[in-house]
Each structure stands twice: as structure tokens, then as C-alpha cells.
């Protein structure tokens, strides 16, 4: 289960998708107040593109066209801010209103908030071009949500529906609220689109059932295939006990005709894992499927019988080691894995962040060898490990990790009962060839902005509302900037621009205030 920095109630699967589209000046009429765009004098207009949720279909989060480097990063200035208003600005406890990165194509920024509303903005000015209103607050879960864009169409989802919009006008092309059956959870994922197919997944937070991976026809929305991430006797129904699985983050589109998802944990307590141990396939796994048919090619399970919420949920990354295609994987389990992309065979794995000796406890429970004394503290905990996506560039893997142990006071909890220590974070570089740690930089709070490469810099954001850049060679922090609010979403870096969803709750930022917003920073 993706770590929740706050909670949201889920709506039933039968809830209809209610949508309205407001275009240009009409965005101000009726309903919630229109979002507000503010331009700032003295800054260059943003330029460039970030065409996919993680920058490219390989999920590398490396911006080869970026102009920002250590030589000019100090010149970043706020060019514009797009502020959410009304119910979309309220946020949800500590989650905030923006948890997904924007997508930028053709001079337009496409953004989705936590209420599933979609916005199209002019990249140069931040002005609203159109808005697609879903307005289903308090029901779309912890996200990340977000959109994908291809061939003039914007693809998105709410908790129970998927939809396609005209990128030019925001008008609905198709929408389907009948994709998920009872027990298959909700859509939380930022989709991906390639080869005429839209790839989605549901995830599930509690109770029997399980998530499902799927592909839709991009033109019609017709369901092409599904793959259940728990082994069951019916669609998405776990036969081995409580199930979860599903996928939270954008999948990897392979050049070999495959699609790879990182999946979440089985929703089971320590007591259940000890009393009724099972591998719980295909939870906490990399699942490689034929992109056209959904047929399983291979899988790699990181944590069989997981009871500590150690998802392998991060977006997989495609790269090569010595000419061999490789998939880089990671997640809340607190490990980075290099897998042979043809077979799923493990090449290396490296622990990142804080670990306190309980990495093999789920395996011990599987073989009936685990005895636990309470209180029982685990690091990484259910809110720790790798919570945002990684980056790969020039022979290195870049990882942002959260150090936050979780304490269980009894055997019935699934995600732990209380924090087991202070929260902090780390940003690390690993050798792509060997997995060896190249450097490790400590940060005082949670790095949630994902790892993003721009020339000789690595960017991310901290939850308390700070944009930072590190020297890729040494890990030294060479740039810091206070954001308007806290930050709980990956950023985008391209051309002369850094786009930052500063969408956390305004009360939790140190020195920040105002509505959640997307902020564009540019160099001259």
C-alpha cells in the first residue's frame, strides 16, 4: 500500500463520473472559484518539454534538453504561479492537493489535482486554457493520480473511472466508469500511453480483494486486457487471504513490446503472515507483461509474505549495463534492484536509507521461523524507504529515501501503530554497474519530489517546502529555495524551467503560505 501521509475515504465503484469542462474565460462561471494565474516580472518565459510522467517512456527522469546546471542554478527566478482554489485547494490532511508531476507538450502544461480535476495551462504564462472538473473530493485516495498525453489526447483517471480528453479543448472523447469490479480497489496511478494503448492499474488499501493491471484502447477506451496482481478464484479476489497488490506508479514501456509494473504489498497483519504464510504472488513484485496481450513474461518478487507494507511500487526504469537491457526497481522496501530486463534475473540489490535488521522477517515467517516480541520496530517502516521515483543518468542511479521507523504494539496492525523514531531523509547515488553507494547525503525531512537529473545537478523537493539541487559528483547541496507551501509531488525539469507542484497543505510549510500551486522557475 502506498504510504499515506494522510487518509481519504473511498467512493463506491458505482459512483458515476460527473464532469464539466470550462474553457478560457468560462472557467470562472459557477461551482468553485476559478484557479488564479500570477506572472512575475523579470523572469524569462518557460520553455522546453516534459512529455511523459517521468520525462520519457523509459522513466529515467533525466532531462537531456535541460539548460540548468551548477553554473546558473542560482539564477532561478519565479516566472509564474498557478494557484488552486475552492475545494481543490483544501487538500486532504497532510497529503495536500497536488501529488503528481505535470506533463508538458507543445507549449502546454497538463496537471491533475487530488480531486481528479485536470488543467491545461500555457507554459509561457501559466494562464488557464481549459479545466476539466471532476470535483470528487475526499475519495480518490493518496494518489499520485496525474495524466498522460499523446497524439493530442489527455488521459486520466478518477478513483473509479478512466477518461480521455481533447488536449486542445478539454472536451471528453471517452469516459468509462465500469472498468473495476468489487474488490479491485481504486485508480490511484498516473497512467502511461504508448502504441495505441493506455496502461492503468488499480490499488487496494484494505480488505479482501486485489489490484488489477490493465490496458485500454487509446482511441475508444475499450478494455483490451487485465492482469490480477493477486492469485485468486475470481477477478481480483485473493484465494490465499487478504490481498492488495495493484500498482501506484507509472509503468515502464519497453522497446521489446513489454510493459512492466511495480506492485504493492499484500494487506495483511503480522499475525496473519505468521499464522497463514504465503508468497502472495504477485505482490511486492516487478511484473513484466506482453504489452499487447497482458500475458506474463516474468516476475521478480522482492518480499514474499510481506507484513510491513514494503511495496516495490516505484516506476521501473529501463537502462543497460554492459549492453544488457536492465530494469531498475525500488520502493518502500528500501532496496534498489537491478534486474535483467529479458528474464527478471537479479543482477544486484543495494539497501538504501535506514535498516534495523528486520529485512528478512517476512521470509522467516514464510518458513515458520519468526517469533516477535512487542513493541516491534521496523525500519524502513510503512512510511519510509523509497517513496518517490528514482532517476538514472551517466552510469548512476539516484534515489531519495525516507528514514522513519514504525513501531507495532501488537500483531493485528497492518501498517504499524506509531512512529518508531524521528523522521529524516537521505539522497543517494549508486553505481549502475555494481549497485555500490557513490555518495549519501542526509536531509532533515522527507524528500518527496522524486530524483530528477539536469546536467550536473540532481533536483528534488522536501516535504516542508524546499526545492534543492545537489552536485551529482559529490552529493553536496548547492541550491535551496523556499516554496510557497509544502511539497508532496515529483517535479519536472526541462529547458530553462523547473516546474514544482507546491501542493501540500499550506499549514505545514515552514515559512510558506497561500493556496496549493504549480510554480514555474526559470533561468535567464
Q: Where does each model-flagged region fall?
A:
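Carboxylate/His-rich catalytic cores and anion/metal-binding grooves
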Residues: 118-132, 215-229, 248, 254-255, ...
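Bacterial signal peptide processing site
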Residues: 29-31
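Conserved blade-register residue in beta-propeller folds
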Residues: 120, 164, 215, 286-288, ...
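Aromatic (tryptophan-biased) beta-strands that constitute blades/sheets of beta-rich domains
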Residues: 34-93, 127-136, 171-180, 222-231, ...
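C-terminal motif of bacterial Sec signal peptides marking the signal peptidase cleavage site
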Residues: 23-27
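Inter-blade boundary loops/turns of WD-repeat beta-propellers
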Residues: 70-73, 123, 167, 218, ...
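Bacterial N-terminal signal peptides that target proteins for export
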Residues: 2-16
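Repeat-blade elements of multi-bladed beta-propeller folds
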Residues: 47-57, 94-117, 138-162, 184-213, ...
Amino acid at each position: 500500500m502506498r504510504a499515506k501521509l494522510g487518509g481519504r475515504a473511498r467512493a463506491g465503484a458505482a459512483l458515476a463520473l460527473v464532469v464539466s469542462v470550462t474553457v478560457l474565460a468560462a472557467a470562472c462561471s459557477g461551482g468553485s472559484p476559478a484557479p488564479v494565474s500570477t506572472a512575475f516580472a523579470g523572469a524569462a518565459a518557460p520553455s522546453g518539454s516534459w512529455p511523459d510522467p517521468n520525462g520519457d517512456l523509459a522513466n529515467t527522469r533525466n532531462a537531456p534538453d535541460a539548460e540548468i546546471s551548477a553554473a546558473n542554478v542560482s539564477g532561478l527566478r519565479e516566472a509564474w504561479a498557478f494557484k488552486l482554489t475552492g475545494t481543490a485547494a483544501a487538500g486532504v490532511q497532510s497529503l495536500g492537493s497536488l501529488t503528481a508531476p505535470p506533463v508538458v507538450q507543445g507549449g502546454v502544461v497538463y496537471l491533475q489535482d487530488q480531486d481528479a480535476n485536470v488543467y491545461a495551462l500555457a507554459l509561457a504564462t501559466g494562464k488557464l486554457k481549459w479545466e476539466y472538473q471532476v470535483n470528487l473530493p475526499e475519495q480518490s485516495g493518496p494518489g499520485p493520480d496525474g495524466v498522460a498525453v499523446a497524439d493530442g489526447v489527455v488521459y486520466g483517471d478518477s478513483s473509479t473511472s478512466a477518461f480521455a480528453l481533447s488536449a486542445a479543448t478539454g472536451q471528453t472523447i471517452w469516459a468509462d466508469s465500469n472498468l473495476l469490479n468489487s474488490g479491485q480497489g481504486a485508480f490511484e496511478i498516473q497512467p502511461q500511453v504508448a502504441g495505441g494503448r493506455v496502461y492503468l492499474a488499480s490499488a487496494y488499501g484494505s480488505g479482501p480483494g486485489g489490484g488489477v493491471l490493465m490496458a485500454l484502447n487509446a482511441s475508444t477506451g475499450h478494455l483490451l486486457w487485465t492482469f490480477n496482481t493477486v492469485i485468486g478464484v475470481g477477478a481480483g479476489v485473493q484465494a490465499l487471504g487478504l490481498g492488495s497488490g495493484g500498482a501506484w506508479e507509472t509503468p515502464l514501456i519497453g522497446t521489446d513490446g513489454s510493459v512492466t509494473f511495480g506492485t504493492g504489498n499484500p494487506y495483511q497483519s503480522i499475525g496473519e503472515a505468521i499464522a497463514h504464510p504465503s508468497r502472495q504472488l504477485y505482490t511486492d513484485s516487478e511484473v513484466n507483461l506482453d504489452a499487447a496481450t497482458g500475458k506474463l513474461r516474468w516476475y521478480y518478487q522482492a518480499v514474499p509474505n510481506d507484513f510491513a507494507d514494503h511495496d516495490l511500487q516505484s516506476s521501473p526504469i529501463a537502462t543497460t549495463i554492459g549492453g544488457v537491457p536492465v530494469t531498475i526497481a525500488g520502493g518502500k522496501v528500501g532496496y534498489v534492484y537491478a534486474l535483467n530486463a529479458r528474464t527478471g534475473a537479479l543482477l544486484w540489490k543495494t539497501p538504501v536509507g535506514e535498516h534495523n535488521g528486520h529485512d528478512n522477517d517476512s521470509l522467516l515467517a514464510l518458513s515458520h521461523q519468526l517469533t516477535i516480541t512487542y513493541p516491534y520496530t521496523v525500519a524502513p517502516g510503512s512510511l519510509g524507504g523509497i517513496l518517490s521515483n528514482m532517476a538514472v543518468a551517466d552510469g548512476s542511479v539516484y534515489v531519495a529515501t525516507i528514514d522513519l521507523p514504525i513501531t507495532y504494539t501488537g500483531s493485528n496492525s497492518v501498517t504499524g501503530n506509531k512512529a518508531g523514531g524521528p523522521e529524516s531523509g537521505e539522497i543517494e547515488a549508486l553505481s549502475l554497474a555494481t549497485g555500490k553507494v557513490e555518495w549519501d547525503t542526509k536531509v532533515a525531512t522527507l524528500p518527496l519530489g522524486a530524483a530528477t537529473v539536469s546536467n550536473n545537478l540532481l533536483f528534488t523537493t522536501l516535504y516542508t517546502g524546499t526545492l534543492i539541487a545537489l552536485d551529482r559528483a559529490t552529493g553536496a547541496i548547492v541550491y535551496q529555495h523556499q516554496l510557497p507551501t509544502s511539497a508532496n509531488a515529483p517535479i519536472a525539469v526541462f529547458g530553462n524551467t523547473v516546474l514544482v507542484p507546491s501542493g501540500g497543505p499550506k499549514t505545514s510549510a515552514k515559512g510558506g503560505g497561500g493556496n496549493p500551486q504549480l510554480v514555474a522557475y526559470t533561468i535567464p
